């Protein structure tokens, strides 16, 4: 079938298998150009492994180090001529490329928040890897059903204590708009922490440790975004910020647990990129469009694979990691360059409907958004029929 992009709001409802595969190959090629990652991990578990930063971590570990990988994700398979999700096709392509190079790859498809998927993952580690020496936690989900209580918590993107008016882009109509966000209630804050805080990461590490599948010296990291002044009302000072602070508290306990066996636990702070999650946040398309414009002009623009490849080389497996005062690994240094942030702030209120395409890189933002779903990738013939029914080998469901 011939598959074209169909966008509704912040979701593209179609995906292109060949485009997703080409995107994965591009990321692998980038890692290969950088050369081997010294002293990297050998057996890696990535929780949230099918898109964005999690996929980039799996690619960097496999093709930069030669690591065996186990990926956990929650994706929809193709069915009845309806394409699967982008993460499904990304993972299928990853498996194909890993097999071509003789690299061990296993995947588990299901709800990472559940006890069932944790148990299936542990069984797969025992069978295929024995133990893991790196656990990457990169889960982005709007809701979580708690495995112990059965309560489903919904995350909320709201300020705390007062309403906030945010500038942004109506991406459907390509117009500047303002959104008034009311403050979160205490219950909404607690629910957001339950979804996006550190509890599930801790549950994963506790379960892996109790099962004996964490190697001595194992490391774990959870990915997060903090941002700077322009995004603080909605991130660090908002309901999501409370979840991020919970992540900071959680990592201290995990670090103590792993340090006893020569290991480590860190929160890794990454730069703002286009993801399905970020595109749904009212101010982020405008912020990203401005950030892309400024960073591309300076030659410092990076995407997921550049960020995570650099994180492994320069911090996670470096003798001189980039660490902030709170002990977080920082890969977002170029985004937070004072000159970059000053220029973004300078342009922020100048953007109008008329100059959207000149003051910002909204065109680049839109292109990156479509790339998430396999569209706009160099070398792919989008007028040619493509087979949507792609399977993932070594998949546990």
UniProtKB/Swiss-Prot annotation:
Its EC number(s): 1.3.1.9, 1.3.1.44
Binding site for NAD(+): 48-53, 74-75, 111-112, 139-140, 244, 273-275
Positions annotated to bind substrate: 225
GO MF term set: enoyl-[acyl-carrier-protein] reductase (NADH) activity; NAD binding; trans-2-enoyl-CoA reductase (NADH) activity
Pathway membership: Lipid metabolism; fatty acid biosynthesis
UniProt keyword annotations, A-Z: Fatty acid biosynthesis, Fatty acid metabolism, Lipid biosynthesis, Lipid metabolism, NAD, Oxidoreductase
Positions of the record's site feature: Plays an important role in discriminating NADH against NADPH: 75
Gene3D superfamilies: NAD(P)-binding Rossmann-like Domain
Activity: how regulated: Inhibited by triclosan.
One GO BP: fatty acid biosynthetic process
Pfam families named among the record's database cross-references: Eno-Rase_FAD_bd (PF07055), Eno-Rase_NADH_b (PF12242), Enoyl_reductase (PF12241)
pH dependence: Optimum pH is 7.9.
Record field: catalytic activity: a 2,3-saturated acyl-[ACP] + NAD(+) = a (2E)-enoyl-[ACP] + NADH + H(+); a 2,3-saturated acyl-CoA + NAD(+) = a (2E)-enoyl-CoA + NADH + H(+)
Catalytic residues (UniProt): 235
Quaternary structure and interacting proteins, as annotated: Monomer.
Family, as annotated: Belongs to the TER reductase family.
Functional note: Involved in the final reduction of the elongation cycle of fatty acid synthesis (FAS II). Catalyzes the NADH-dependent reduction of the carbon-carbon double bond in the enoyl moiety that is covalently linked to an acyl carrier protein (ACP). It is also able to reduce trans-2-dodecenoyl-CoA (DD-CoA).
Protein name as it appears in the record: Enoyl-[acyl-carrier-protein] reductase [NADH]
Organism per entry: Burkholderia mallei (strain ATCC 23344)
């Amino acid at each position: 079938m011939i598959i074209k992009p169909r966008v509704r709001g912040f979701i593209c409802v179609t995906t292109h298998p060949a485009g997703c595969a080409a995107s994965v190959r591009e990321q692998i090629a980038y890692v290969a150009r950088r050369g081997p990652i010294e002293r990297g991990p050998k057996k890696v578990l990535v929780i949230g492994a099918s898109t964005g930063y999690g996929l980039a971590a799996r690619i960097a570990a496999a093709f930069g180090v030669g690591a065996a990988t186990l990926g956990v994700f929650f994706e929809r398979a193709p069915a009845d001529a309806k394409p699967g999700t982008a993460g499904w096709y990304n993972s299928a392509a990853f498996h194909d490329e890993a097999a071509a190079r003789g690299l061990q790859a296993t995947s588990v498809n299901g709800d990472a928040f559940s006890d069932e998927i944790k148990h299936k993952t542990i069984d797969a580690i025992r069978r295929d890897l024995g133990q893991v020496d790196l656990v990457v936690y990169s889960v982005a989900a709007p809701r979580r059903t708690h495995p112990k209580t059965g309560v489903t918590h919904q995350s909320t993107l709201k300020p705390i204590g007062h309403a906030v008016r945010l500038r942004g882009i109506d991406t459907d109509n390509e117009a500047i708009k303002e959104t008034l966000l009311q403050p979160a209630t205490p219950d909404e804050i607690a629910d957001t922490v339950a979804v996006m805080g550190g509890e599930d990461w801790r549950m994963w590490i506790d379960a892996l440790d109790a099962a004996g599948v964490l190697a001595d010296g194992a490391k774990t990291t959870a990915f997060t975004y903090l941002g700077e002044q322009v995004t603080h009302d909605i991130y660090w000072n908002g309901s999501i910020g409370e979840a991020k602070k919970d992540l900071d508290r959680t990592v201290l306990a995990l670090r103590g647990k792993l340090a006893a066996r020569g290991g480590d636990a860190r929160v890794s702070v990454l730069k703002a990129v286009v993801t399905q999650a970020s595109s749904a946040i009212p101010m982020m398309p405008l912020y990203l469009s401005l950030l892309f414009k400024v960073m591309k002009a300076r030659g410092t623009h990076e995407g997921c694979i550049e960020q995570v490849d650099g994180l492994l080389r320069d911090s996670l497996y470096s003798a001189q990691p980039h660490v902030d005062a709170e002990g977080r690994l920082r890969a977002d240094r170029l985004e937070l360059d004072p000159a970059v942030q000053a220029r973004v702030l300078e342009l922020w209120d100048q953007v109008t409907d008329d100059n959207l395409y000149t003051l910002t890189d909204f065109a680049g933002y839109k292109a990156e958004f479509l790339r998430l779903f396999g569209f706009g990738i160099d070398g792919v013939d989008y007028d040619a029929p493509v087979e949507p029914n792609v399977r993932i080998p070594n998949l546990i469901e």
